[in-house]
């Protein structure tokens, strides 16, 4: 019996547990895409639901705590989350997911923006100076973002790079 127990312990110690890559998705469409590309290699937390307006989210303590644990922050960008994302990033204290770092990913950076206004001021109402941030409504954009996201997942989790690239195909 003791021999079997020792063999069991040896097997456990020889196979280190793999921790999933924590992904913080600002909107459900990006959470779904990250889950599709990452499978069981990612743990996705989605900050909003399809019933919420992503323009008007509050950086609640629960969101900040989830962002604090993330290796990748995945948002639309193009000012869609401008009302709450800067506060969330600052309060999270997570250097990995700050703008300019590999853990910060804005989907809008990988597509051609439409409806960019010639001039933007408050007299025109809620105008996005970077263009229409609702990029997920065009399926061609999803493919462009998926390609870039698979590369970013591979960069952040090099041990599973082939897995992410295969799922992107």
Label every model-predicted segment:
Residues 4-13:
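Sec-dependent N-terminal signal peptides
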Residues 14-18:
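N-terminal signal peptide c-region/cleavage motif recognized by signal peptidases
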Residues 19-169:
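Extracytoplasmic metal-acquisition and chelation regions
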């Amino acid at each position: 019996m003791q021999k079997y127990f020792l063999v069991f312990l040896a097997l456990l110690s020889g196979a280190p547990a793999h921790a999933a890559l924590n992904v913080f998705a600002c909107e459900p469409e990006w959470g779904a895409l990250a889950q599709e590309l990452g499978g069981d290699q990612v743990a996705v937390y989605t900050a909003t639901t399809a019933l919420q307006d992503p323009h008007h989210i509050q950086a609640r303590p629960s969101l900040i705590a989830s962002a604090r644990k993330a290796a990748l922050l995945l948002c639309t960008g193009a000012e869609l989350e401008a009302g709450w994302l800067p506060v969330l990033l600052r309060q999270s204290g997570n250097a990995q997911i700050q703008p300019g770092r590999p853990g910060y990913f804005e989907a809008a950076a990988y597509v051609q923006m439409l409806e960019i206004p010639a001039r933007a001021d408050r007299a025109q109402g809620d105008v996005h100076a970077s263009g229409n941030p609702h990029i997920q409504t065009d399926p061609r954009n999803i493919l462009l973002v998926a390609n870039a996201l698979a590369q970013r997942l591979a960069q952040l989790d090099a041990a599973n790079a082939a897995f992410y690239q295969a799922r992107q195909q």
